[in-house]
């Protein structure tokens, strides 16, 4: 279907640039943005510090992602989902409750199911290794220029373009530079985009387990004194574990043998899935909050963790990054259709307005949830148990929660509605 702006001719460019857009960082957000822009005919180069043999190693990242229904629609719109679908496990139900090792589950439970979301599964669990491999495969088959194992050493902003200097290679130019280079974003720092953040003194212990009984597509989240424990359904009778502990405790647990590790996990996990065993390597990730005050600077925009790295308590980190990707791709695509310079201030301001407030809310919410739920204060525990019970008893409120988590609330970008750019 043609877009109303498709028939507006492009204005002649005074400067011949190497690309329309340069993306710093070839992770999940960076490659997804590159493929989205490529689908709209916007020439893109991705500069990634990791060599392919590093980033595509099955042990590069042990995490799994709870992709929202909207994120799944975007991947489908970009032609990525068909090959990913057999690696994805639908989330049909979510149960949230207080918990403690060796205790019976709290009677106050928030339970979200198919009756709360009429559009199908609320989300899909996908392992990092499968998503990363599919993005790499699609990038190789696209018109995107991927320069792996290369490091950006400088960026210079001009009135008409940005020049990026790459260690050991010639500089390249584009209308816009996008920072998708993570929470320690060099792009953001060089652009003068200041950050706020702190460490939580917590780490997430991450692994996959095999279990005796089927999970039936149910995701569980228990709020323990030290932090949340998430049990997330994966394919082949496996579940992904995201187990948060205080930093020193987590480091001690991570250093244990597999057998001792499981001995500590079992009382927290319970026996509802029968006997459990490790189904791969174990990982540990320190947790922190890191957010920039703005997502844009002259000819620079940030996406994903480069702009907002949050606590995993709500499982929305990658989904939030994909919202950035969809919004930025849309405003750049529409600017191109109008025949305008992709890096003009009004375009980047539109992106900031679209995503800035939502990301600020996410940072505030995840930080507040972590403070509220990562403790065993009897008063706070009583308040949160009462709150969960009230939400569970209110169908309209449950549906609102699910719509927000699924990315279906508000006015999402076209890609998140499953529509092409």
Regions found by a protein language model. Give the residues of each.
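N-terminal FAD cofactor-binding segment of flavoenzymes
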Residues: 59-101
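FAD/FMN-dependent oxidoreductases across multiple families
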Residues: 251-345
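C-terminal helical "tail/cap" subdomain of flavin- and related membrane-associated enzymes
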Residues: 8, 330-421
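Glycine-rich FAD pyrophosphate-binding loop
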Residues: 38-63
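Conserved N-terminal helical subregion
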Residues: 15-17, 87-190, 198-203
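Conserved FAD-binding catalytic core of PHBH/FMO-like flavoproteins
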Residues: 75, 161-170, 176-282
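N-terminal Rossmann-like FAD-binding beta1-loop-alpha1 element of flavoenzymes
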Residues: 19-46
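Conserved Rossmann-like nucleotide-cofactor binding loop
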Residues: 29, 52, 184
């Amino acid at each position: 279907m043609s877009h109303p702006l498709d028939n507006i001719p492009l204005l002649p460019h005074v400067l011949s640039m190497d690309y329309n857009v340069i993306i710093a960082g070839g992770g999940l957000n960076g490659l997804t943005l590159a493929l989205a822009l490529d689908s709209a005919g916007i020439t893109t180069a991705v500069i990634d510090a990791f060599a392919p043999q590093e980033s595509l190693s099955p042990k590069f990242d042990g995490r799994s992602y709870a992709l929202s229904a909207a994120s799944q629609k975007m991947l489908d719109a970009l032609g990525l989902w068909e090959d990913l679908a057999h690696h994805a496990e639908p989330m049909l139900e979510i149960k949230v409750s207080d918990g403690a090792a060796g205790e019976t589950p709290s009677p106050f439970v928030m339970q979200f199911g198919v009756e709360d979301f009429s559009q199908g599964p609320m989300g899909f669990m996908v392992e990092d290794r499968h998503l990363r491999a599919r993005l790499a495969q699609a990038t190789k088959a696209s018109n995107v220029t991927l320069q792996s194992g290369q490091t950006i050493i400088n960026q210079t902003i001009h009135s008409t373009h940005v020049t990026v200097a790459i260690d050991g290679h010639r500089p390249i130019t584009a209308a816009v530079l996008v920072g998708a280079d993570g929470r320690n974003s060099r792009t953001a720092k060089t652009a003068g985009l200041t950050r706020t953040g702190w460490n939580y003194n917590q780490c997430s212990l991450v692994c996959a387990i095999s279990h005796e009984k089927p999970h039936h597509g149910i995701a569980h989240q228990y709020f323990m004194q030290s932090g949340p424990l998430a049990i997330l359904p994966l394919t082949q009778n496996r579940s992904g574990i995201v187990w948060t502990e205080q930093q020193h405790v987590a480091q001690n647990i991570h250093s244990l043998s597999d057998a001792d590790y499981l001995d500590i996990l079992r009382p927290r996990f319970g026996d509802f899935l029968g006997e459990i065993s490790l189904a791969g390597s174990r990982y540990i990730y320190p947790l922190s909050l890191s957010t920039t005050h703005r997502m844009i600077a002259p000819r620079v925009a940030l996406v994903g963790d480069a702009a907002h790295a949050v606590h995993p308590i709500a499982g929305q980190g990658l989904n939030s990054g994909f919202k950035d990707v969809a919004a930025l791709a849309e405003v750049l695509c529409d600017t191109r259709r109008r025949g305008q310079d992709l890096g003009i201030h009004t375009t980047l301001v539109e992106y900031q307005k679209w995503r800035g407030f939502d990301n600020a809310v996410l940072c505030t919410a995840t930080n507040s949830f972590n403070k509220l739920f990562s403790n065993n204060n009897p008063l706070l525990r009583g308040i949160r148990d009462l709150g969960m019970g009230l939400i569970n008893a209110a169908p309209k409120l449950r549906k609102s929660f699910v719509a927000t988590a699924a990315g279906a609330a508000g006015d999402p970008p076209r890609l998140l509605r499953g529509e092409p750019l």
